[in-house]
Amino acid sequence: MKTLLKNGTLIDYKTNTFEKCDILIEDDKIAKIEKNIEEKAEKIIDCTNLYIMPGMIDIHCHLREPGFEYKETIKTGAKSAVCGGFTTICPMPNTKPTPDSTIILQKIIDEGKRVGLCNILPYASVTKGERSEERRVGKECRSRWSPYH
């Protein structure tokens, strides 16, 4: 499937420029970025007066799941993030239970993948239960996940 974004203002962070252009997307990948693309597409979106930019990363957000779902869930938080242009969010560890083990962290990561709206990379509590008493998570995480996954 082809989607054509017409007349948008592309924000290019590498060159610090704003440029009016069209973007052709084929099979969920950017195929062309040019002025005045005249190619047929199944979907054409008029982006006049709109900005097009890479997805942003929120390195400090608060999802309340697990434990406080009455405030917010991973799904509702991810929906809000995507509506604001964020494709990756990093929730703080103030949930119940506290993400102070790889088991709890993996549950949050798995729920984020199940929801499937954006990348969810949760912070871990450095100490057990956020009580500054017993350091726990560092070694466990290093043994389970590479820092560059």
Question: What do these predicted ranges mean?
Answer:
Residues M1-L4, L10-P54:
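Histidine-rich, glycine-flanked metal-binding segment
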Residues G8, I23, D28, N49, ...:
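Divalent metal-coordination and catalytic microenvironments
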Residues I45-D46, P91, P122:
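General beta-strand structural signal in soluble alpha/beta enzymes
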Residues L50-V115:
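Metal-associated gating/positioning segment near the N- to mid-region
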Residues E111-V126:
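A glycine-rich helix N-cap at a beta->alpha junction
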Residues G138-H149:
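Positively charged, low-complexity/disordered segments
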